[in-house]
Amino acid sequence: MKLEMICTGEEVLAGQIVDTNAAWFGNTMMEHGIECQRRVTVGDRLEDLVSVFKERSHEADVILVNGGLGPTSDDLSAEAMSLAKGEALVENEIWRERLENWFTRNGRVMALSNLKQAMLPESAIMIDNPVGTACGFAVKLNRAWLFFTPGVPFEFKQMVYEQFIPFVKQRFDIAGDVALRKLLTLGQGESSLADTLEQIDLPSGITIGYRSFMPHIEIKLFARGVGAIAQLDRLEAQIRFLLGNAIVACDRKSLAEEIHSLMVNSGLSLSTAESCTGGMIASQLIDLSGSSSYLDQGLVTYSNESKVRVLGVKPETLDDHGAVSIATVEEMAKGVRSILNSDFALATSGIAGPTGGTDDKPVGTVAIALATKGGVYSQMIKLPRRSRELVRSLSTAVAFDMLRRELLGEAVIVDYGSIGRFQK
């Protein structure tokens, strides 16, 4: 089965919004063993929509169309499909009744423009939208089934799960013969990783891809066919052997999600004292449901005065070593752990830039400490000076990885490679 996606909307085409629906759809399909082989974005122009529907209907088996089902003048998907099919738009009485009931139930007067959402191509199969007013539908044109969904993300996602995937599986033999495995790395550039892995003799049906999203490079293993899928475990073991410390997460988890899983399963607690990362460590964990089971409190102690007053850092430590130092960051970590009585504490202090650097401590110099019941681990790292955001995100990632390694019983301080010079 050949699956494609057509995304609609001037705002998407012009880059005014990021099309997160498309990325989510491709990833979700891959999880179900279905590969989306092409994606096209079209603006809100009737003739362009008609043209692309006709063109792609000769090439694909299934086309998911996203957007353009609302009540306004720029919602043109149903009209374009009727023109491509050469048939009239007709009112779907079931959906009209659903619309009227929805507005009555919510105590609102329905504007007549909403009736547009009940106008479907004559041969269309109505597809339920259980959480919105835009009616989905499916039409067969030439070789392809075109499946229409609203652009509102929560409506779109629910329809994909409840309507689209069952629709496809009822009509096509989906053997799940495509698999994707992801390995998240830290500290090595894309070219360095590619050079290292070039020596691997890839099994037939498997390709390696790379995706850069700082501070990480994601290695993607695509397997097509049952035989290729069976080789994934062996291939992953080879990659882990070659890359060693660079791999920090897998199974499509972010590093924060990896920490989250480990902390929840450990039953232990964590606190943070952040300076240069400005709450980024705590924020990434709080984004995940259930983090309150282990995250006691996150403090942002940005000024020297707050480090002394809140965390108990000695004034003489700051005078003798400076805020960005092993001595200071260790006292920060020990202080917050003692105050909150947590099992672990992470602390950061650094120079994120673009100003504030010196010859001894240039922009990108960051001190990180992990306090545990058994002692304190700390290191000073020198990061690329490309942007303030990069320094903060890399510092957060290294702090997370120190905690991850402690939880797994591995060496906490390691050399990641090209992200900078590390000092214990």
Swiss-Prot record:
Which InterPro entries does the protein's record reference? CinA, CinA-like_C, CinA_C, Competence-induced_CinA, MoaB/Mog-like_dom_sf, MoaB/Mog_dom
Report which superkingdom the organism of origin falls in: Bacteria
Write down the Gene3D superfamilies for this protein, in alphabetical order. CinA-like, MoaB/Mog-like domain
The UniProt entry, under Pfam families, shows: CinA, MoCF_biosynth
SMART domains per UniProt: MoCF_biosynth
SUPFAM superfamilies, alphabetically? CinA-like, Molybdenum cofactor biosynthesis proteins
Family statement: Belongs to the CinA family.
HAMAP family per UniProt: CinA_B
This protein is called: CinA-like protein
Organism whose genome encodes this protein: Shewanella pealeana (strain ATCC 700345 / ANG-SQ1)
